Amino acid sequence: MSVQAQKFNFEDYVYPFGCRTYASPDNKGNLWSVTQYSFESQAYDNYLVEEVYIGHGMMSAKSKYRYHTEENAVISDVQLRQNRLTGSTKYQDKLILFAFPEKDKPFKWTETDRGDKYQCTSEYVYINASIDHNSLFLKSIKMTRDNSYIVENEKHRFIETSYWVSNYGRLITFVDWDGTKKASSKLDVLDYIQEISEEEYNKMKK
């Protein structure tokens, strides 16, 4: 691996403004919940981040993540989830929150999240997005987590796709269950997003 997450200012992608708000729609497109992320500390290579989950206007969970950088990746060492109803649960899985692609090819890895194995990819793509009513053509990092599993002799597939842009952070996350795709979490000021070709991007940037 040739890219260093610290060297390339991963903060510009992860939490560029220190605090971000994401909206999660329900099946009808209505607002279901809001999640807010904020830095609690930014000591070198040791970042403590708090996540507050608000559903139906009430805080229902609070999580704390400690991140460190390792080669291409920003890694979450520990999750501490404080649930309003059930108390605290601690997960020890080491998960990659964000990773830079290699210079000329995707960066791929495998990770285990609470017993489920995911095949993951980080790659550069181009997008057209409207952010706060401004139409922009941007180079983005697309991260994909892919998990196949079998339940009662039936094969299922879960794919999570997120788009990250420097100085904006994570724009949106899509989830695809067995071919049914929907947005699960999006930046509150994101109006729309679509992936475009490099040729179209170069044409519109001229």
Question: What residues fall within each predicted segment?
Answer:
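Conserved functional acidic sites
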Residues: 6-206
